[in-house]
Amino acid sequence: GRPDFDTPKKIKDAAYESLNAGHVFYTSNYGTPALRKEIAKWENEHHNVNYEASEVLVTVGVGEATYASMAAFLEEGDEVLVPNPVWLNYIHVPSSLGATPVTYSLKEENDYQIDFEELESKITEKTKMIVVVNPSNPTGGIFSRKTLEKLSEIAIRNDLLVVSDEIYSQLVYDGAE
């Protein structure tokens, strides 16, 4: 996304200092060890998980992350549950891999929460993965805790991999969680 505010000065300063320190060459395809360590630390502190830096993979953006996560697990003929509306890469990537995107609706009249009756009716023996974008792009809707808990139950019961796009998780307002 493209926020309507400038990059914070401390980020610009850190980039400038990094360039001046000679950090201009290729790094590990997994991301720098220091960055991976900080990401693991942040996830552990904010999401009550226990990741090691070795479990973190840094990509150049959501496009690469989408492709890598889907290419690693999908096979031709698999189905992927994808919210509608959604960023189009979640439709194009599985299609390019020979998998079939199957959409589930996020409707304004339902406060952009998942209609679980509809979702469960779309799960077949070919369903391998579900995509969750929270907060939603493009609606801005945020799933309630109840929605996320029920979604977790469905994913576990049906042995579905979950691709969770949380790129906008720190851009929530008005007391939303």
Where are these regions (language model features)?
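Short glycine-rich anion-binding loops that position phosphate/pyrophosphate groups of nucleotides
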Residues: 2-3, 63, 134-138
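N-terminal small-domain helix-loop-helix segment of the aminotransferase-like
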Residues: 1-61, 68
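Conserved PLP-anchoring active-site segment centered on the Schiff-base-forming lysine
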Residues: 72-94
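Short acidic capping loops at alpha-helix termini that bridge into adjacent secondary structure
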Residues: 50-56, 76-79, 126
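Active-site phosphate-binding strand-loop segment of PLP-dependent enzymes
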Residues: 102, 106-176
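Glycine/Thr-rich phosphate-binding loops of Rossmann-like dinucleotide-binding domains
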Residues: 6, 66, 90-91, 139-140
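A short helix-loop-beta submotif of the ANL/AMP-binding
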Residues: 95-102
